[in-house]
A protein has these predicted regions:
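N-terminal FAD cofactor-binding segment of flavoenzymes
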Residues: 23, 27, 42-92
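Short, well-ordered alpha-helices that flank and scaffold nucleotide-derived cofactor binding pockets
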Residues: 22, 26, 123, 188
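N-terminal Rossmann-like FAD-binding beta1-loop-alpha1 element of flavoenzymes
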Residues: 3-38
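Short beta-strand to alpha-helix junction loop
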Residues: 57-58, 104-123, 134, 175, ...
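Predominantly flavin-linked oxidoreductase catalytic cores and closely associated redox partners
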Residues: 127-242
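Flexible phosphate/Mg2+-sensing switch loops adjacent to catalytic phosphate-binding sites
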Residues: 36-39, 43-45, 194-200
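Helix-loop-beta segment of a Rossmann-like dinucleotide-binding subdomain
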Residues: 95-114, 151-153
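Phosphate-handling catalytic cores of nucleic-acid transaction enzymes
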Residues: 34, 71, 99, 107, ...
């Protein structure tokens, strides 16, 4: 395969980072993922993904995008034990004071733990011949061409601060999440700080993992109970996983 561009850097081996690396792999000769954590070999929680312990799943759009970028990924997850089914016919939904009618919708979804999903995606990304992972490494700052403002590289530093690396990059994708330093880097480089808009939603989560037995969840993949607005502010869900 011929590539139009030379090098790209992706900050963060998150879900968005892995998908970005996969998308870029078809256009760049080399893609480097810079990740602060030491990535686990298998399915395990890690510090950089604190939300991983909560319930996860893929609805229709996510399911289709994942399978488009990683063909047969859903079959691979299903083989790992992740439940796949119809998001209407195989789930129980309680909304506005009543149970929704179960029927085949033709819309597929999957319920899977975040560590399992990330592990499967990392394996697929590592099979790409032109994507490499730089683990236990912090992003320091991008490098810009002073003549025209184009990004030309990125400086990365090992977590123990013993090694600095200058990476060539025609594109830098920041998938580092809420701790992103991009606004600061842009301001320090003379581009101005982007306007930041935040929406406070006041939502909290609590999760418990339980052992599932055959026949639990009323022969469904998941049970979702939503509060009725405006007074019903609590919701609950029980999702099967691998």
């Amino acid at each position: 395969m011929s590539h139009r561009y030379s090098s790209a850097v992706v900050l963060g081996a998150s879900m968005s980072g892995l998908l970005a690396a996969r998308a870029l792999s078809g256009h760049f000769e080399r893609v480097i993922i810079v990740e602060r954590d030491v990535l686990p070999e298998g399915e395990a929680l890690r510090k950089g993904v604190p939300q991983a312990a909560h319930a996860h799943g893929l609805l229709v759009s996510g399911y289709r995008v994942m399978d488009a970028y990683f063909p047969r990924m859903m079959s691979e997850l299903e083989a790992m034990g992740a439940p796949v089914g119809d998001i209407v016919g195989d789930f129980l939904w309680f909304q506005y004071g009543r149970w929704k009618l179960r029927h085949p919708s033709g819309l597929r979804g999957i319920t899977v733990s975040r560590p399992c999903l990330e592990a499967a995606m990392r394996r697929r990304v590592k099979r790409l011949g032109n994507v490499t992972f730089l683990e236990s490494t912090d992003g320091v700052r991008p490098i810009f061409d002073p003549a025209d403002g184009r990004v030309t590289g990125f400086i990365a530093r090992s977590r123990d601060r013993s090694v600095n690396q200058t990476l060539d990059a025609e594109l830098v994708v920041d998938a580092s999440g809420r701790g992103s330093q991009s606004p600061k880097w842009l301001e320090e480089s003379g581009f101005g700080k982007p306007e930041e808009i935040s929406v406070k939603v006041n939502v909290g989560y609590a999760t418990r993992i339980c052992e599932r037995r055959p026949g639990d969840l009323f022969n469904s993949i998941g049970v979702i109970v939503s509060g009725t607005p405006p007074t019903g502010t609590r919701a609950a869900g029980v999702l099967a996983a691998e």
